[in-house]
Regions:
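Conserved acetyl-CoA-binding loop-helix of GNAT-fold acetyltransferases
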Residues: 39-42, 48-61, 84, 88
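Active-site acidic-Proline motif in GNAT/NAT acetyltransferases
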Residues: 30, 43-49, 77-78
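Acetyl-CoA-dependent GNAT
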Residues: 1-39, 58, 62, 66, ...
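Conserved GNAT acetyl-CoA-binding A-motif
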Residues: 56, 63-76
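Conserved beta-strand-loop-alpha-helix junction that forms the acyl-donor binding cleft
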Residues: 73-82, 101-104
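Conserved acetyl-CoA-binding loop of GNAT-fold acetyltransferases
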Residues: 87-96
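Short low-complexity, flexible loop/linker segments enriched in glycine and/or proline
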Residues: 87-88, 109-111
Length: 115
């Protein structure tokens, strides 16, 4: 789970605390060659304060220290706020890739769907 991921990638992830609450977080790691930002989020009431950018800079610096040269992330196409953010801070949308999923354990996915 998340604990194992954090243990494999020490010092890479970040949680922003504002007013004693978690305002945002990034789960960050790498495979030795490419870094990846997972589950990037900033609570709506804390957006437009530079928190997201500061967290990205933290993660990018941690990856640079680990000699990682490229970083990727996945953003849903319908996430207009997130996609505008990535474009605004200079990330490039790749047009040359297709993204594929294969579900190994449906229970693992649906148990988090708390609708």
């Amino acid at each position: 789970g998340v604990e194992a991921f954090l243990n494999r990638n020490p010092g890479m992830s970040v949680v922003a605390i504002e007013d004693g609450q978690a305002a945002g977080a990034i789960l960050c790691g790498h495979d030795g060659r490419r870094g990846c930002l997972y589950h990037v989020c900033v609570a709506e009431k804390y957006r437009m304060r530079g928190i997201g950018k500061a967290m990205v800079i933290f993660c990018m610096n941690a990856l640079k220290e680990a000699h990682i040269n490229k970083v990727s992330l996945i953003a849903f196409t319908r996430n207009d706020v997130g996609n505008a953010f990535w474009k605004q801070i200079g990330w490039t949308k790749r047009e040359d890739l297709n993204y594929y999923d294969f579900v190994l354990n449906e229970d693992n996915i649906t148990k988090f769907n708390m609708d």
